[in-house]
């Protein structure tokens, strides 16, 4: 009986240390009021952008088709492609990944580039986040859901699914998926990650992109601009600048994970 209690206390203390050990977490928690206006993507403006040309259906001139409504731009395709790409970066294969009916689009490739840039800019934070998020496998997916909801539903951006937030969510999800694929216990949750991330983003695109004049065509233009800017600045000491997404991201992860882990031992 004593041995069982000692083991439980030891496990609880281990997880508490894991969630509180990162000095950056403690520092960022002191700035809870910070909110990411563009998910750390300073080169992507969040003010309304000019409308871009869209196609019309051959039947009924009054029916407008936005590019984000086209089947080849189904958001699940973006998530599948990025998750597959990110998992491959770790030398692994997502053997049961859903197929892409229309193949890899140039927009998917742009998302790969921007997601990679986003992760590089937040590499240390991402590593700390994933360590804490996956500390207790039985609650990893539910923790991921809470993080996505908390960050994705923040209201301080003009567009609920801004380009920066879109890139950040897919990039973060891809990193978590890659980490899950390394664990036999967590591999089966990658598809759950895919479905949840896709539905979350799809819902918000349909709710906001029309009103805020967002489109994949505009995403491509701004994405190219960001890539060019990144090439110019990648040798600069970016680490000296504190990113707003990192601030709220660290706060969200630390609070949610620490609370849930402690609760799981009660």
Swiss-Prot record:
Protein localization: Perikaryon; Synapse; Endomembrane system; Mitochondrion membrane
A GO cellular component annotation in the UniProt record: perikaryon
The keyword Membrane is assigned to this record: yes
Motif window: BH2: 208-223
CDD domains: Bcl-2_like
GO BP terms: extrinsic apoptotic signaling pathway in absence of ligand; intrinsic apoptotic signaling pathway in response to DNA damage; positive regulation of apoptotic process; release of cytochrome c from mitochondria
Motif (BH1): 156-174
Leader peptide range in chain numbering: none
Pfam family, one: BH4
Motif BH4 location, chain numbering: 75-94
Segments of skewed composition (Basic and acidic residues): 24-35
PANTHER family: APOPTOSIS REGULATOR CED-9, BCL-2 RELATED
Subunit-structure text: Interacts with asymmetric homodimer ced-4; the interaction sequesters ced-4. Interacts with egl-1; the interaction results in ced-4 release. Interacts with dre-1; the interaction inhibits ced-9 activity, either directly or indirectly. Interacts with dct-1. May form a complex composed of ced-9, ced-4 and mac-1.
Family: Belongs to the Bcl-2 family.
Name listed for the protein in its UniProt record: Apoptosis regulator ced-9
Organism encoding this protein: Caenorhabditis briggsae
């Amino acid at each position: 009986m004593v041995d069982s209690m000692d083991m439980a206390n030891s496990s609880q203390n281990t997880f508490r240390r894991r969630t509180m050990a990162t000095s950056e977490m403690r520092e960022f928690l002191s700035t809870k009021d910070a909110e990411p206006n563009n998910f750390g993507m300073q080169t992507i403006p969040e003010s309304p952008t000019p409308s871009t040309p869209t196609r019309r259906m051959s039947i009924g001139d009054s029916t407008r088709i936005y590019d984000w409504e086209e089947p080849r731009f189904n958001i699940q395709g973006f998530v599948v492609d990025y998750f597959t790409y990110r998992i491959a970066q770790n030398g692994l294969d997502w053997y049961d990944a859903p197929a892409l009916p229309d193949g890899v689009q140039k927009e998917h490739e742009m998302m790969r580039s921007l997601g990679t840039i986003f992760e590089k800019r937040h590499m240390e934070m991402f590593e700390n986040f994933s360590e804490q998020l996956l500390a207790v496998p039985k609650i990893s997916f539910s923790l991921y859901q809470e993080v996505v909801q908390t960050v994705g539903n923040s209201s301080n951006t003009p567009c609920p699914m801004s380009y920066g937030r879109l890139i950040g969510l897919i990039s973060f999800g891809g990193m978590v998926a890659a980490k899950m694929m390394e664990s036999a216990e967590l591999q089966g949750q990658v598809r759950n990650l895919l479905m949840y991330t896709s539905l979350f983003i799809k819902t918000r695109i349909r709710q906001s992109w029309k009103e805020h004049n967002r489109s994949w065509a505009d995403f491509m233009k701004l994405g190219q601009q960001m890539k060019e800017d990144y090439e110019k600045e990648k040798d600069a000491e970016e680490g000296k600048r504190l990113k707003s997404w990192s601030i709220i991201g660290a706060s969200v992860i630390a609070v949610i994970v620490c609370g849930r882990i402690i609760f799981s031992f009660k």
